[in-house]
């Protein structure tokens, strides 16, 4: 019910904003309306994130774990983020692999998307890299990581990163402002999936966010037996002409 109520409120606010847009005349009014629209979008995002946190904490949503090809996630990430990285002059590289992992496809996508979004938000120049490492301590696990050349995160700030409304302490060079809720959602998802999270960072030297996930064998493709289809034949009369 809470989710439906919030959706109705958001829809009503959007209708109000659209009605205003059709009636404004001056450029100043249009700027005010644009600010209102951005505020509405921010409020919707915050409410949605808070509801997600409440649902995760309340156990009303659970991960749907299954074998999942990591290649699908990595290729989608490259398509999703390469354009914005190019616009900002940031090198964006995704190192593809062919592992299958035990995960919830939607959850793992949201987790890594959050890491990449944060990296692009705070990196002014340089590169953002998505890659995979084998875990030295756990041979049947891999680490999916996002490296950036951003401003880095101080140790005292890293401790609080996964709390609600906490940010890295830096201002985005691109004018973006996060809600401070994305990593809080990541923390709850990784906890329910039993994925360790690792953060490596030093001020002025960039950051790396990693999660450790179990690998599984690729599902075997079972060939379907081919059924013989009887040929339908007709009787034909053969006429032979002798021209001798």
Language model: regions and residue ranges:
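Glycine-rich ATP-binding loops of the HATPase_c
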Residues: 194-200
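A conserved beta-strand-to-alpha-helix junction within the catalytic ATP-binding
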Residues: 64-79, 239
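Disordered, acidic interdomain junction associated with two-component signaling
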Residues: 45, 156, 210-242
């Amino acid at each position: 019910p809470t989710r439906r109520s919030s959706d109705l409120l958001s829809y009503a606010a959007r209708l109000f904003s659209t009605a205003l847009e059709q009636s404004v005349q001056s450029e100043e009014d249009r700027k005010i309306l644009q600010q209102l629209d951005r505020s509405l979008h921010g409020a919707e995002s915050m409410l949605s994130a808070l509801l997600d946190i409440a649902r995760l904490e309340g156990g009303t949503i659970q991960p749907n774990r299954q074998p999942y090809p990591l290649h699908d996630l990595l290729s989608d990430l490259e398509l999703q983020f390469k354009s914005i990285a190019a616009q900002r002059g940031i090198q964006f590289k995704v190192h593809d692999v062919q592992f299958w992992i035990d995960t919830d496809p939607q959850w793992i996508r949201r987790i890594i998307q959050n890491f990449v979004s944060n990296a692009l938000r705070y990196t002014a120049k340089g590169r953002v890299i998505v890659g995979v490492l084998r875990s030295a301590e756990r041979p049947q696990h891999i680490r999916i990581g996002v490296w950036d050349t951003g401003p880095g995160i101080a140790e005292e700030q890293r401790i609080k990163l996964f709390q609600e409304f906490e940010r890295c302490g830096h201002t985005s060079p691109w004018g973006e402002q996060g809600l401070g809720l994305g990593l809080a959602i990541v923390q709850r998802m990784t906890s329910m999936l039993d994925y360790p999270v690792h953060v490596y960072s030093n001020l002025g030297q960039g950051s790396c966010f990693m999660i450790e996930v179990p690998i599984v064998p690729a599902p075997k493709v079972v060939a379907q037996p081919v059924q013989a289809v009887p040929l339908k034949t007709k009787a034909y009369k053969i006429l032979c002409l002798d021209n001798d």
